[in-house]
């Protein structure tokens, strides 16, 4: 008799990277969505503008969960206009304490002209060191590449693109269908 697995299929994927350099902040992400060993979609858009366009964000994890969190963050940004850190902390509090939100499986990187933040389901709100942060299955590869490139003459967008290409070379859950959003930074 063969053993069968009744475990739910595991969604894999994505690499999201942010780089803050030279008066710009850039968030980029790949477009691959996989379930198990199968690519379901190659051109998903996991990076977008939020609020009134003064915040950009990217997500890794379950798509429906991420959109729920983006909506919640936009609501917090309406409550605390121009205060991304405060809005993110308030979202993180809700995420940790709300029974429904606690079940959501996603991570987010968000940025405005002043700050870049990573938000996790455990209530962490982290600001990256040296203006570089990555999440997702290829995040460590993209992060290493971006840190290696940050002190070169490349601009923020070039660093994000090259680093995501490197991650796609290594991580089977990351592809080269890259979406970029950028803002002027202080």
Swiss-Prot record:
Q: Does the keyword RNA-binding apply?
A: no
Pfam families found in the cross-reference section = Proteasome
Gene3D superfamilies recorded for this chain?
Answer: Glutamine Phosphoribosylpyrophosphate, subunit 1, domain 1
Q: How is its activity regulated?
A: Allosterically activated by HslU binding.
- Name the keywords, alphabetized: Allosteric enzyme, Cytoplasm, Hydrolase, Metal-binding, Protease, Sodium, Threonine protease
Q: Name one GO molecular function term.
A: metal ion binding
Which amino acids does the record list as binding Na(+)? 168, 171, 174
Catalytic residue list = 14
Main subcellular location: cytoplasm
Please list the reactions this protein catalyses: ATP-dependent cleavage of peptide bonds with broad specificity
The protein's matches in InterPro entries, at most eight in alphabetical order, are given as: ATP-dep_Prtase_HsIV_su (IPR022281), Ntn_hydrolases_N (IPR029055), Proteasome_sua/b (IPR001353), Proteasome_suB-type (IPR023333)
* Regions that span the bilayer: none
* Entry keyword Iron: no
Q: Name one GO biological process term.
A: proteolysis involved in protein catabolic process
CDD domains assigned: protease_HslV
Q: According to its UniProt record, where is this protein located?
A: Cytoplasm
**EC number annotated for this UniProt entry:** 3.4.25.2
Q: What class of enzyme is it?
A: hydrolase
Please provide one cellular component term from the Gene Ontology annotations of this protein: proteasome core complex
- Purpose: Protease subunit of a proteasome-like degradation complex believed to be a general protein degrading machinery.
Quaternary structure per UniProt? A double ring-shaped homohexamer of HslV is capped on each side by a ring-shaped HslU homohexamer. The assembly of the HslU/HslV complex is dependent on binding of ATP.
- Which HAMAP family does the protein's record reference? HslV
UniProt similarity note: Belongs to the peptidase T1B family. HslV subfamily.
Name of the molecule in the record: ATP-dependent protease subunit HslV
Organism of origin: Bradyrhizobium sp. (strain BTAi1 / ATCC BAA-1182)
Please name the gene that encodes this protein.
hslV
């Amino acid at each position: 008799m063969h053993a069968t697995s009744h475990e739910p299929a595991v969604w894999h994927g994505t690499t999201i990277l942010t780089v803050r350099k030279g008066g710009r902040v850039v968030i980029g992400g790949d477009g691959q969505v996989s379930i198990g060993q199968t690519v379901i979609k190659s051109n998903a858009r996991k990076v977008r503008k939020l609020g009134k366009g003064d915040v950009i964000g990217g997500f890794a994890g379950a798509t429906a969960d991420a959109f729920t969190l983006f909506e919640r963050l936009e609501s917090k940004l309406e409550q605390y206009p121009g205060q991304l850190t405060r809005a993110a902390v308030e979202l993180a509090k809700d995420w940790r304490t709300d029974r429904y939100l606690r079940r959501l499986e996603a991570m987010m990187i968000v940025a405005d002209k002043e700050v870049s933040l990573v938000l996790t389901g455990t209530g962490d709100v982290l600001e990256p060191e040296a203006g570089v942060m990555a999440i997702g299955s290829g995040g460590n590869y993209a992060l290493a590449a971006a840190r290696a490139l940050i002190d070169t003459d490349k601009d923020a967008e070039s660093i994000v693109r090259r680093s995501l290409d490197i991650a796609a070379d290594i991580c089977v859950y990351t592809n080269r269908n890259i979406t970029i959003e950028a803002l002027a930074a202080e």
